[in-house]
């Protein structure tokens, strides 16, 4: 079993990820981030696609989020499981605000899975009530 670093402060590691929902208009990609230390989930936006512009826009939205800004003076590491081809453009967004970039699919999954499982469980619970 792989071991991962344990966050010792807010925003030390922040997983950025998305999941797809089906809608009447077609797929919708929900972009989220989660702070490994607090487990706080940032709801960044919903886009019709995962094009580079959509990904970059939502990373920018993260750096402007009020809760995120509150803790970013000590820097942050953005953990992504994909989008390596956008690394230069992502760094252009996060470096000026004291951010670093880490690509690790397994670490990203480790950090994001609790949020995704909680979301799934919430939907299933809601469905059972109907």
Which residues fall in each region the model found?
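Intrinsically disordered, low-complexity boundary segments flanking structured domains
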Residues: 1-6, 65-66, 87-91
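Short active-site oxyanion
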Residues: 73-77
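RNase H-like two-metal-ion nuclease catalytic core shared by retroviral integrases
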Residues: 78-82, 87-130
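Mobile-element integrase/transposase regions
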Residues: 1-30
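Short His-Asn-centered micro-motif
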Residues: 16-17, 34, 80-83
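Short, glycine-anchored, charge-dense loop/turn motifs used at functional sites
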Residues: 37-40
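Active-site beta-loop-alpha junctions of metal-dependent nucleic acid enzymes
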Residues: 44-70
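Short acidic, S/G/P-rich loop/turn micro-motifs used as interaction or catalytic elements
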Residues: 20-24, 48-50, 83-87
């Amino acid at each position: 079993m792989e071991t991962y670093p344990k966050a010792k402060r807010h925003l030390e590691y922040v997983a950025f990820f998305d999941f797809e929902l089906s809608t009447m208009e077609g797929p919708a990609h929900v972009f989220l981030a989660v702070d490994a230390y607090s487990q706080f989930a940032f709801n960044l936006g919903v886009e019709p696609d995962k094009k580079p512009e959509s990904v970059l826009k939502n990373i920018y939205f993260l750096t402007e989020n009020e809760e995120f800004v509150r803790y970013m003076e000590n820097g942050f590491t953005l953990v992504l499981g994909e989008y390596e081809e956008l690394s230069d453009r992502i760094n252009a967004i996060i470096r000026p605000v004291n951010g670093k970039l880490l690509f690790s699919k397994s670490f990203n999954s480790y950090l994001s899975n609790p949020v995704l499982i909680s979301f799934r469980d919430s939907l299933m619970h809601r469905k059972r009530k109907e």
